[in-house]
Regions:
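Transmembrane beta-barrel domains of Gram-negative outer membranes and organellar outer membranes
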Residues: 11-206, 212-214, 218-329
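Sec/Tat signal peptide C-region and signal peptidase I cleavage site
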Residues: 5-11
Length: 329
């Protein structure tokens, strides 16, 4: 039996990682992530407790996203220095910003096929029950590809818009002033048993939020269809500076460019027989020197649960392939 791509594709980027990937939930499928997230350095910490992340598959290649956290910002007490007064510690919390996104996997390559044939598309025909048919092949090719993944290379784009909610989270310094637009490109590939995923994106910022680059790389392996682990390198760097007088708390402008570079280890573990409930774990820290004057984190972490919902996937019977001389005696 041949199932659709959505049932074969496995998670890679996305929660619990910062780097995303081209995979989508599948037509009319939900991927819902509940995560407890932390990022702490010697001066401050940022936490989402929890983060609610809702994703819906529109066709085989498009994903709609809405995300909103309960955010907590911690300022750690700092002693006075010859140039700076003492800073009292405080913890504030509130509703975080809303994140709206749409991911489009516009290119995917299947093993044993041309790199240009039938690889571009939207996948929206799946909404009407029309999935891309399997490529015709001879028996030897079918046998060789039986253990191959559905795709071995894909590319997507994932525009995302951050919006402030009608609360006092911005004036209290819980979240950065919005709106902010993030435009990334994601690429993933399989090389033997290794999975690779890369993402590069640009935050366009606003009058109170610097523009910045986000770059991520994931390298890992799927040990079984229930267990996968990855090593992640992620770098976020301001592209400009802003004059003082905008923002509140740690989002106040006027300082030097900031950069955060982290190395993390994480993965996913299926918790039930039907593979609809997954445990998400990731932990890491900066691999650069951590001081009181830079934003390099002493630790980052993600602990969460992923719920997968959706209709049963349609299947099509595999056409029996006869050998050239079969039936001749």
């Amino acid at each position: 039996m041949l199932s659709t791509l959505a049932t074969i594709a496995h998670a890679q980027g996305g929660p619990p990682f910062r780097t995303d990937d081209p995979d989508t939930p599948g037509n009319k499928h939900w991927e819902i992530n509940f995560g407890w997230i932390g990022d702490r350095n010697p001066q401050r910490g940022a936490y989402q407790v929890p983060d609610f992340d809702f994703n819906y598959g529109l066709g085989d290649r498009i994903q709609l996203k809405y995300e909103i956290p309960i955010a907590i910002e911690e300022t750690r007490a700092q002693p006075a220095t010859p140039t700076q007064p003492a800073i009292p510690g405080q913890v504030i919390g509130g509703l975080g910003e809303s994140l709206l996104g749409i991911k489009w996997r516009f290119y995917e390559h299947h093993p044993n096929t041309s790199w240009l044939k039938n690889d571009f598309g939207t996948g929206l025909l799946a909404l009407f029950g029309h999935h891309a048919p399997p490529e015709p092949s001879d028996p030897e090719d079918l046998a060789a590809s039986a253990s191959e993944p559905a795709t071995n290379f894909s590319i997507s784009t994932y525009p995302q818009l951050y919006l402030d909610n009608p609360t006092r989270s911005v004036p209290r310094g819980v979240v950065a002033p919005g709106p902010n637009f993030f435009l990334p490109i994601e690429v993933n590939a399989r090389i033997g048993p290794i999975r690779l995923d890369g993402e590069v994106g640009y935050n366009f910022g606003n009058h109170a939020l610097p523009q910045s680059w986000g770059r991520g790389l994931l390298v890992g392996h799927e040990f079984t269809d229930r267990t996968e682990a990855y090593l992640e390198l992620y770098d976020e760097q301001d592209a400009n500076t802003l004059p003082a007088g905008q923002g509140i708390g740690q989002f106040a402008t006027g300082g030097p460019k900031q950069r955060e570079t982290t190395l993390g280890l994480g993965g996913r573990q299926t918790l039930n027989h039907s593979k609809t409930l997954n445990l998400l774990l990731m932990a890491g820290r900066s691999f650069q020197t951590i001081t009181n004057t830079n934003s390099q984190p002493s630790w980052i972490a993600y602990v969460g649960v992923q719920v997968l919902l959706g209709p049963a996937e349609p299947v099509t019977p595999q056409v029996e392939q006869k050998l050239p001389n079969e039936g001749k005696r």
